Amino acid sequence: MEEKKQQNVTIKGTKDGITLHLDDCCSFSELLMELDEKLSTHYYDGDGRSLIEVHVKVGNRYLTEVQQEEIRTLIRNKKNLVVDSIESDVITKAEAIAWKEETEIVPISKIVRSGQVLHVKGNLLLIGDVNPGGTVIAGGNIFVVGSLRGIAHAGYYGDSDAVIAASVMNPMQLRISDVAMRAPEEKEDGAEAAECAYINENNHIVVDRLQLLTHLRPNLTKLERGIV
C-alpha cells in the first residue's frame, strides 16, 4: 500500500478569501515548491476582476523578511491573489525583549521631586509621591501609590487605552497618548480618594473612581486593586 504523502500546505476557503496553513517542520524550499504547485493546481479567479485576500499561517516557523517576501511574490504571481497577512507563532529574541519591556510592570519606590522626570517603557508602579513640577512617563499604565501632584503621561508611545491611577489625584496635568487634560479643580480637604483617569468615547480624559477600572479596562491586571 502506497504511503500517503505528508501535506505541507493546506488551503481553506473563508468568507474573506483563503487561508494557507503552512507546515512548520519541512524545509523552506520544500514549502515553497508545494505552495507553488498547489496554487497552480487550484484556480482562484473570483469574479475575474476583484483580488482575493490570502492569509498565511506558518505556525512555529520563524520567517525572515526575505523569506516573507518570497512567499508574497510567489502568491502575487498567481492570478488575482494578494497576501493580506503572514502570521507566525514565534518571534525573535529582540522582539521578545522589546515586548517584555513594553508590557512589564516596573515597581519604583521614590519621591519624584520638582524638575525630575521618571520614564519607563512599560507600566509604572510608583510607591511614593509625584510632587508639583515632577513628571512621570510610561509607555503603558501609571499607578501611583501616593499623591500625584505633578505631571503624568501614560500611553507615551500611542496607547490610548492606558490609564493613570493614584491614591491621591491632584495633578498639574494628565496626558494619555496624545490627549492632554489640565489640572482638575482642587479637592476640598478630606475629599481625596483613589481615582483613575482614562480616555472616554469622546476622546477626552476623564477622572473617576478607581473602582470603575474593572469595568472600563477588564483586561488590566489585578494590580490596581491593591491601590485602593
From Swiss-Prot:
SUPFAM superfamilies linked to this entry: Cell-division inhibitor MinC, C-terminal domain
Protein name (Swiss-Prot/TrEMBL): Probable septum site-determining protein MinC
InterPro entries: CAP/MinC_C, MinC, MinC_C_sf, MinC_N_1, Septum_form_inhib_MinC_C
Swiss-Prot/TrEMBL keywords: Cell cycle, Cell division, Septation
Superkingdom of origin: Bacteria
Species assigned in the record: Bacillus cereus (strain ATCC 14579 / DSM 31 / CCUG 7414 / JCM 2152 / NBRC 15305 / NCIMB 9373 / NCTC 2599 / NRRL B-3711)
Pfam families: MinC_C (PF03775), MinC_N_1 (PF22642)
Role this protein plays: Cell division inhibitor that blocks the formation of polar Z ring septums. Rapidly oscillates between the poles of the cell to destabilize FtsZ filaments that have formed before they mature into polar Z rings. Prevents FtsZ polymerization.
Biological processes annotated in GO: cell morphogenesis; division septum assembly; regulation of cell septum assembly
Subunit structure: Interacts with MinD and FtsZ.
Protein family membership: Belongs to the MinC family.
